[in-house]
């Protein structure tokens, strides 16, 4: 489940799905605008992807409202987080990870962040993230 403004996080999301499929999972790429809390129980594990926006925060118009709605369903759910950023040091991801832990989510692996467009290392890390959810 992802939101992407420039296509960078969408590229990462595609790599996550590819990694999950290579590991034997049935995986679906879903835009944040098409996902909601009522769908959480349909999935054994979920990767959430959102770039850093503004002052190192989640995208506020689509992704954050969707994710906030899902928070009550995170307890005991295996998840992974990923996203791109233009500047900063990844504070948005650390804050997001803390929120997920406080909500009782099980982080399946280290989160993946990359600056701007994902390079080969970031694509590989996203594929590994997808596989870790299987």
Where in the sequence are the language-model features?
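Short hydrophobic segments within beta-strands
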Residues: 1-3, 82
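FMN-binding flavodoxin-like domain, especially the glycine-rich phosphate-binding loop
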Residues: 8-11, 15-134
């Amino acid at each position: 489940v992802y939101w992407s403004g420039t296509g960078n996080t969408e590229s990462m999301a595609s790599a996550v799905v590819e990694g999950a499929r290579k590991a034997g999972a049935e995986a679906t790429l879903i835009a944040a605008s098409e996902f909601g809390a009522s769908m959480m129980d349909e999935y054994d594990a979920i990767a959430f992807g959102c770039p850093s926006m503004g002052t190192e925060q989640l995208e506020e118009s689509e992704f954050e409202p969707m994710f906030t709605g899902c928070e009550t369903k995170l307890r005991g759910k295996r998840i992974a987080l990923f996203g791109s950023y233009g500047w900063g040091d990844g504070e948005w991801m650390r804050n997001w990870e803390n929120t997920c832990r406080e909500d009782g989510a099980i982080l399946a692996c280290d989160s993946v962040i990359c600056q701007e467009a994902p390079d080969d290392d970031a694509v590989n890390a996203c594929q590994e993230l997808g596989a870790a959810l299987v």
